[in-house]
Regions:
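A short structural micro-motif
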Residues: 33, 58, 95-97, 128-129
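His-Asp-centered metal-binding catalytic motifs of divalent-metal-dependent phosphohydrolases/nucleases
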Residues: 45-76, 85-96
Length: 136
């Protein structure tokens, strides 16, 4: 039987593979946006799951940038994690490193959110205040 992670367990897994403050900030940002859209789109009973998908979407990026979305599947399967989580996080690499298409609305939101939060973060860094006025 596959394991469901709570937020604390997901954070521990993320920080096992990521230490760069930028990557951790990005993960928390995507988590927050995913939680927002889960509620906004009528998936209120899955807010925590959507958030964990956002938090773990780049689990393997810091250690395995050339194997992004590939290594994370192995890492999660070794821990017997939920296949929905594995599919969702891997799908945001569709057309780049994997051929797993975003199918569920959550996966499509992740696909867009990952890029948009990166763009917004880059734009914020261009401001004199940088990220100092942004609190997650």
């Amino acid at each position: 039987m596959s394991k469901q992670l709570n937020r604390e367990e997901a954070w521990a897994l993320l920080t096992e593979y990521n230490q760069d403050p930028f990557h951790l900030h990005h993960a928390r940002t995507v988590e927050g946006v995913m939680r927002y859209f889960a509620q906004e789109l009528g998936y209120g009973d899955e807010v925590d799951f959507w958030g964990i998908v956002g938090l773990l979407h780049d689990l393997d990026f810091e250690r395995y940038p050339d194997q992004h979305c590939i290594q994370s599947q192995e890492i999660m399967r070794e821990r017997d994690l939920d296949e929905r989580l594995i599919h969702a996080t891997a799908s945001h690499g569709y057309g780049i490193t994997v051929d797993i298409q975003p199918e569920h609305e959550m996966e499509k939101v992740l696909f867009a959110t990952d890029e948009l939060t990166g763009l917004i973060g880059a734009a914020a860094l261009m401001r004199p205040s940088k990220l100092s006025l942004i609190h997650i």
